[in-house]
Amino acid sequence: MKYHDGKDRCSWANPKNPIYIDYHDKEWGVPVYDDHKLFEMLILELFQAGLSWECVLNKREAFREAFDDFDVYKVSAYDEEKQAQLKENKGIIRNQRKISAAVSNATIFMKIQEQYGTFSEYLWKFTDHKIIHEMGKTSSELSDQVSKDLKKRGMKFVGTTIIYSYLQAVGVVESHEEGCFLYHKE
């Protein structure tokens, strides 16, 4: 699909939303190795469950402010009072179960960092540090494995579909559509 700038993009990239276009062009499918960014995306994907990714992206800056710039240490220490404040924040998705999951997932994220040195090392070990090229899926054997392991560790809102979306977002799985200017063959 041609956009106003003459570039073809993936069909899901809403041409009327510059935030979405920027995300598609500069972030989605780009390999991420930085734990801070990996944590941010994990939290955003958690809040996306049952909603559109575009909705979450439109609220991203409010999430960033509300969640202390996605500082995993600060988020892991959120008490009931801070969680109640988040529940009242109209700039974010105010779902108590998701807010609680973000806090408990932060603690588990740090435990994984302790075990593997970085969360990045943990995540990329599932593919032997290789990018997987596949399109047209909402889950895979890989997302099943990662989801199962994260659930075993106690994380919430990490089902296989959410994890597949996360893997695409952080570039472990590259899924740009054929015809998209960012499409790469294996």
Task: Give residue ranges: language-model regions.
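HhH-family (HhH-GPD) DNA N-glycosylase catalytic core used in base-excision repair
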Residues: 1-186
